[in-house]
């Protein structure tokens, strides 16, 4: 049920004039707010800014789902020039569209030039990027998808994997990469090309499938299938 205009005006006045205190959420928008109390969501229009203890969000338009109160945010859907930054969740990003499920810490950004950046991993795509912060799952899908961390660079249409938190950094534990043309992975001093590239941290082996190329120290080797052991830095290729 849409609330009456008077309540909307009072709500907007209270959140734009009063300074935000710890534990509060400050929300501003130029073209007002539409609240649907029964459905438990509200719409913010034009130059929206949301600032809380957990995150800051800027976008053209935002839909907010809530639980017990308007400030008890459970989910955000933001459209247009989206910029998101969370010090608590240690992640920031931008894109044309963003969905953020607050309680399960799952974030998805979409659109050309989308990016998500954590403490140790940078992700880019013209399709979409999705990260589940609690379990470490991530997925990049679309043109110009790329993942970068301290030891590895990955480029492919589809990058699917998982990372875990170590003492001082995030570590990639599983990885599945594929591309209709070719996937690219650079690990330290070795460059690898293949249609499909898989990695399992338990075995420390990178597996390369179809149209395989491995380049190291100006040496180039090709084949149909290859493996690289990251533990002892050795590799094998066969046709």
Residue ranges and their predicted role:
Residues 2-10:
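Sec-dependent signal peptide recognition
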Residues 10-18:
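Hydrophobic h-region of N-terminal signal peptides that target proteins for export
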Residues 18-239:
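N-terminal amphipathic/hydrophobic interface segments
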């Amino acid at each position: 049920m849409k609330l009456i205009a008077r309540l909307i005006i009072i709500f907007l006045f209270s959140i734009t004039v009063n300074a935000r205190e710890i534990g509060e959420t400050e929300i501003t928008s130029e073209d007002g707010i539409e609240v649907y109390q029964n459905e438990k969501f509200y719409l913010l229009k034009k130059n929206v800014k949301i600032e809380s203890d957990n995150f800051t969000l800027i976008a053209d338009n935002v839909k907010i789902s809530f639980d017990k109160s308007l400030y008890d945010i459970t989910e955000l859907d933001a459209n247009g020039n989206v910029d998101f930054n969370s010090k608590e969740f240690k992640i920031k990003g931008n894109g044309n569209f963003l969905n953020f499920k607050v309680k399960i810490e799952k974030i998805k950004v979409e659109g050309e030039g989308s990016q998500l950046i954590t403490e140790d991993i940078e992700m880019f795509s013209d399709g979409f990027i999705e990260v589940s912060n609690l379990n470490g799952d991530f997925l990049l899908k679309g043109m110009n998808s790329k993942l970068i961390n301290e030891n590895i660079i990955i480029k492919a249409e589809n990058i699917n994997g998982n990372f875990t938190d170590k003492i001082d950094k995030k570590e990639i534990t599983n990885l599945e990469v594929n591309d209709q043309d070719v996937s690219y992975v650079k690990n330290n001093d070795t460059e690898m090309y293949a249609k499909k590239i898989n990695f399992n941290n338990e075995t420390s082996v990178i597996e390369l499938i179809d149209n395989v190329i491995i380049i190291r120290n100006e040496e180039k080797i090709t084949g149909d299938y290859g493996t690289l052991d990251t533990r002892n830095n050795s590799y094998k290729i066969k046709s």
